């Protein structure tokens, strides 16, 4: 046992050096807490940053977009607009459907938003149409968020109506009950119903009208309370055969008598079991199917939700007939898991590379083991804190830990290198550990808190980008803090027990060769540094030129928002001429599906035609293209999209818009392309004037591609122009006309069949097979006040007009959305600037407002705050360094290293062809924290040499640079190798990680080369400035 004199120091490390058992057990506790925390952490693609979003859907079959807007959407919007915490309200009113999406502030709990929405719907109930089949239905889901899982249900033996009924009652309800599921939608529209197709000629010949038939059916099928009898000894409940359950029963229904003979419904109509809406259809690949899309609630854990669904599926499918097949077509968690696995592999690779570089420099196994223990201990211990903060294992937190690998080893290296230096001088290991740890303690604290200071501004970033990177910043900060603790406790304790003069002097051939190599490098550096110190102004001009170059590169580098990921799923919109019918669109969709399924990268395809909560019009179709796993296809998603669009261009009469699904979804509506730009006006007429003009100009811009608009005002309308005087004379009201038209052509839901498991509708319509098109209007008959039958054509003229296929609102005002993509040779920043320049040339009137939406709006917000974010990081670090050094000047010397990092990062991004996006910006901010450590280590030792050894500033900084060259080089290479796996990543999610790695590797290389020479020069210049300032003050005091 080594006996130390009472004067031996050690600073905060002394207690831990002297108590190895307690220190070891403390570290074991940290390790166990981290392991337990890791097992408890959920897995997700990104941190949960969803806006609280609620979608309200109201279906009113047969209603035109104009009727849906005025009668359904507008009353609801007026009530929703009064809710507190509402960030944005958008709506889409199309034929028979109103979809309102409510996006709330990030700080508002989703449950509170749900209560407000329910209260608003209740308040608007009396303002909605009295014949609305169902009240508005809300769901806690973002419609723009792609489904976490898509399932297709098919059968070769059963009709789709039966399949849909079983899926709805046996499968969908159970999945909806799983925690985290926000909405389960069934696409395909094959819900069972009894369809009554009236023969217009038959009822006209009998002097009947469709209203007569409707009244007879609704009166014959009821399900209401009948009471009970309560006698002296027993009670009897009353029941009756008041319901009709099958199509056969409806055929036998007597609707009227003529000459004493009954007229049954089957005499004047075709009554059959069919689908509630015959203008809806879905396909899985080429087979008609019921497609089940499962969307998560905002904030729900996607992995655990998907796992729960998969665990329940076998049990659910067992309840279905054997002829029914359930297929999982897509599962987003597959790619999420693959991405997280790849990131974890890169983390392990970074740890291995860092340990390797430590051994290369220390050339000693015991000395390598010490940081080899410190690195995983610091990283694993971080998991325990992540659990308490409700974080998850996701790409960003794992990226933070990967980058932290290079950071956390720095502290251990600095401590080991300093203690080893004293052991090599002949001191006992315990004494060397106490002396070296005590001497280096302030440096460790400076490195730690100045690095954490850089991360502080990230915590104050607003909106969704700030939420996104909060987990990243805190995870990295926690790892750095734990590393500092380990370096001041475990590392010096292990050095005192594991290092010795013999172990450090023991050399093999590799050790001797590498030692000579390092000696030659240090000698060459010393000669170069001496020359540089003799030309300070030239060196200063180089430093200033890097600052100017970094500003120029910042201005001219292409800028983006968030890397476009390859998640293996493509969302598509198929657009046909505005007058296309359901049958025509279904045929076009099948043609396109045939082309898409021939592509070698495509694994499966689901498609949907019809109007519902996601598809606004009959002339459009929704597609979801599921690609093969990344390792089973040759091309990334962007190349696949380009190939598919080229192939589909050969299909006449359709336009295909494709975009890859992303883990980060900011939009609130399903769009055709990745980016959106809106025009908002006080009237539809203003939009009809200016949208075509702007579209024409935008489509000519090379910075944009796939430019399209949701403005469709050429939908065919048969306008029934009623002569009100003639109608009034015959006792026919406008309500009679609307009812007659609705009965004939609205797929009107006139009655409900109640069963124990579900409810089914009775649908009334005219059989138009023999009278297609506008000729069907000639068959409409109305009843006059004297009981006669009057043809509609006798009181009305039919005019063919055009009208919008859908009417969109943003915050209650008409709006149109222009969607666009960005070509490969341009950036989002280029596109945004081109749109803004084009808008200025149009001189839009004051009642037209424009705004970017979704990720484009977030890009503008992030770009505007980026400069201030970097300034805040620099200021925060200056304040921390100024406090630690009790100096106004030394922090400036340290911060002078920053421009070199910026130049290196921006040059690397340019060379790699990467955009300056939010991921790359985070890398630059981290570089601010990394590169200043070189200056800190130099200045700490220079100040100590001046103070304790009486050296001149020049000699002190020169010796400090030579003395700290090896740990500086070692820590820089460790940080570089920690970022290298991210830069070289090629697996799933590599697009997200690569910009961070590229920027950091480039910044570290350039800064390492330059700061070794510029920092000493700037240190001496500021020293001279301080002396000159002191002399001036002294002179003024003497004169005073």
From Swiss-Prot:
Q: Which UniProt keywords apply?
A: Cell inner membrane, Cell membrane, Membrane, Transmembrane, Transmembrane helix, Transport
Regions crossing the membrane: 15-37, 345-362, 367-389, 396-418, 438-460, 472-494, 535-557, 867-889, 909-931, 968-990, 1000-1022
Q: Which Pfam families match?
A: ACR_tran (PF00873)
What does the record say about induction? The mdtABC operon is transcriptionally activated by BaeR.
| Family annotation (InterPro entries) | AcrB_DN_DC_subdom, Acrflvin-R, Multidrug-R_MdtB
Q: Where in the cell is it found?
A: Cell inner membrane
| A Gene Ontology biological process term | bile acid and bile salt transport
Quote one Gene Ontology molecular function term: xenobiotic transmembrane transporter activity
Q: Which domain of life is it from?
A: Bacteria
Topology relative to the lipid bilayer, per the entry, is:
Multi-pass membrane protein
Gene Ontology CC terms, in alphabetical order = efflux pump complex; periplasmic side of plasma membrane; plasma membrane
By sequence similarity, the record places it as follows: Belongs to the resistance-nodulation-cell division (RND) (TC 2.A.6) family. MdtB subfamily.
Q: Partners and quaternary state?
A: Part of a tripartite efflux system composed of MdtA, MdtB and MdtC. MdtB forms a heteromultimer with MdtC.
Give the protein's function: The MdtABC tripartite complex confers resistance against novobiocin and deoxycholate. MdtABC requires TolC for its function.
Name under which the protein is recorded: Multidrug resistance protein MdtB
Question: Which source organism does the UniProt entry give?
Answer: Escherichia coli (strain K12)
């Amino acid at each position: 046992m080594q006996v130390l004199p009472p004067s031996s120091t050690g600073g905060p490390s002394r207690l831990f050096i002297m108590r190895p058992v307690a220190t070891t057990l403390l570290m074991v506790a940290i390790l166990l807490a981290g392991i337990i925390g890791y097992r408890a952490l959920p897995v997700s693609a990104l941190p949960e940053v969803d806006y609280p979003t609620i979608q309200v859907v109201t279906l009113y079959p047969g209603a035109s977009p104009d009727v849906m807007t005025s009668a359904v959407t507008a009353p609801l919007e007026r009530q929703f607009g009064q809710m507190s915490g509402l960030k944005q309200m958008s709506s889409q009113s199309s034929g028979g459907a109103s979809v309102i999406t409510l996006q709330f502030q990030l700080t508002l709990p989703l449950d509170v938003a749900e209560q407000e929405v329910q209260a608003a719907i209740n308040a608007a109930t009396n303002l909605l149409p009295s014949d609305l089949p169902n009240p508005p239905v809300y769901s806690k889901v973002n419609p723009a968020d792609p489904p976490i899982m898509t399932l297709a249900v098919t059968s070769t033996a059963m009709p789709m109506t039966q399949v849909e009924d079983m899926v709805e009652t046996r499968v969908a309800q159970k999945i909806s009950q799983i925690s985290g599921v926000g909405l389960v939608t069934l696409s395909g529209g094959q819900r069972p119903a009894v369809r009554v197709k009236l023969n217009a000629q038959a009822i006209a010949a009998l002097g009947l009208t469709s209203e007569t038939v409707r009244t007879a059916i609704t009166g014959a099928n009821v399900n209401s309370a009948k009471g009970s009898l309560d006698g002296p000894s027993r009670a009897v409940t009353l029941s009756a055969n008041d319901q009709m359950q099958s199509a056969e029963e409806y055929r036998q229904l007597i609707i009227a008598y003529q000459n004493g003979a009954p007229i049954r419904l089957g005499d004047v109509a075709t009554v059959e079991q069919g689908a509630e809406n015959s203008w809806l259809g879905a396909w899985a690949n080429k087979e008609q199917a019921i497609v089940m899309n499962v969307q998560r609630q905002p904030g729900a854990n996607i992995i655990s939700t998907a796992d729960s669904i998969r665990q329940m599926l076998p049990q659910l499918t067992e309840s279905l007939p054997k002829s029914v097949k359930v297929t999982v077509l897509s599962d987003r968690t597959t790619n999420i898991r693959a991405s997280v696995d790849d990131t974890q592999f890169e983390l392990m690779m970074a740890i291995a590379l860092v340990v390797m570089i430590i051994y290369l420099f220390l050339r000693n196994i015991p000395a390598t083991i010490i940081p080899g223990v410190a690195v995983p201990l610091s990283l694993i211990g971080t998991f325990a804190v992540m659990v308490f903060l409700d974080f998850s294992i996701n790409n960003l937190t794992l990226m933070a830990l990967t980058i932290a690998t290079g950071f956390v080893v720095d502290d251990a290296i600095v401590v080991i290198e300093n203690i080893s230096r004293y052991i090599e001088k002949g001191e006992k290991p315990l004494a060397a550990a106490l002396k070296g740890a005590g001497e280096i303690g302030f440096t460790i604290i400076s490195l730690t808190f100045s690095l954490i200071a850089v991360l502080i501004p990230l915590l104050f970033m607003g909106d969704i980008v700030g939420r996104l990177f909060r987990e990243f910043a805190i995870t990295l900060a926690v790892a750095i803090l734990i590393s500092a603790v380990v370096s001041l406790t475990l590392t010096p304790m292990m050095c005192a027990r594991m290092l010795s003069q013999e172990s450090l002097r023991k050399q093999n051939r590799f050790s001797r060769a590498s030692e000579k190599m390092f000696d030659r490098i240090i000698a060459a550096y010393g000669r170069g540094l001496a020359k540089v110190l003799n030309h300070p102004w030239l060196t200063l001009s180089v430093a200033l030129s890097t600052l100017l170059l970094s500003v120029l590169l910042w201005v001219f580098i292409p800028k983006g928002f968030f890397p476009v990921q390859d998640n293996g799923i493509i969302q598509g919109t198929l657009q046909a001429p505005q007058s296309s019918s359901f049958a025509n669109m279904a045929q076009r969709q099948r043609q396109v599906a045939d082309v898409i399924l021939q592509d070698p990268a495509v694994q499966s395809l689901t498609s949907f035609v019809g109007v519902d909560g996601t598809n606004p019009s009959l002339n459009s179709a929704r597609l979801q293209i599921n690609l093969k796993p990344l390792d089973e296809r040759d091309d990334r998603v962007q190349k696949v999209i380009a190939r598919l669009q080229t192939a589909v261009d050969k299909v006449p009469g359709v336009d295909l818009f494709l975009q890859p699904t992303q883990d980060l979804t900011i939009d609130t509506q399903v769009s055709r392309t990745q980016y959106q730009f809106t025009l908002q006006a006080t009237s539809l007429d203003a939009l009809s004037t200016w949208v075509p003009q702007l579209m024409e100009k935008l489509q000519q811009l090379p910075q944009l591609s796939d430019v399209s608009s949701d403005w469709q005002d050429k939908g065919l309308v048969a306008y029934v122009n009623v002569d009100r005087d003639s109608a009034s004379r015959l006792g026919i009201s406008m309500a009679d006309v609307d009812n007659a038209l609705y009965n004939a052509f609205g797929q009107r839901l006139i009655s409900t069949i109640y069963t124990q498991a579900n409810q089914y509708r009775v649908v009334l319509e005219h059989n138009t097979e023999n009278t297609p098109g506008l000729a069907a209007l000639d068959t409409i008959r109305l009843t006059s006040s004297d009981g006669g039958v009057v043809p509609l054509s006798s009181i009305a003229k039919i005019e063919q007009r055009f009208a919008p296929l859908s009417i969109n609102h943003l915050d209650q005002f008409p709006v149109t959305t222009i969607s666009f993509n960005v070509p490969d040779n341009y950036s989002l920043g280029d596109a945004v600037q081109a749109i803004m320049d084009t808008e200025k040339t149009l001189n839009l009137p004051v009642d037209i407002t424009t705004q970017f939406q979704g990720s484009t709006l977030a890009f503008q917000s992030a770009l505007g705050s980026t400069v201030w974010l970097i300034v805040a990081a620099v200021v925060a670090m200056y304040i921390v360094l100024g406090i630690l050094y009790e100096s106004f000047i030394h922090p400036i010397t340290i911060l002078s290293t920053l421009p070199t990092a910026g130049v290196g990062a921006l040059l690397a991004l340019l060379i790699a062809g990467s955009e300056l996006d939010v991921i790359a910006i985070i890398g630059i901010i981290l570089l601010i924290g990394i590169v200043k450590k070189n200056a800190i280590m130099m200045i700490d030792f220079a100040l100590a040499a001046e103070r304790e050894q009486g050296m001149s500033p020049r000699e002190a900084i020169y010796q400090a640079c030579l003395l700290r060259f090896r740990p500086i080089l070692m820590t820089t290479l460790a940080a570089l190798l920690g970022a290298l796996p991210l830069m070289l990543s090629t697996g799933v999610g590599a697009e997200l990680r690569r910009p961070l790695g590229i920027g950091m590797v480039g910044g570290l290389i350039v800064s390492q080369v330059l700061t070794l020479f510029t920092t000493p020069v700037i240190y001496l210049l500021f020293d001279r400035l301080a002396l000159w300032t002191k002399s001036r003050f002294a002179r003024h005091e003497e004169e005073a």
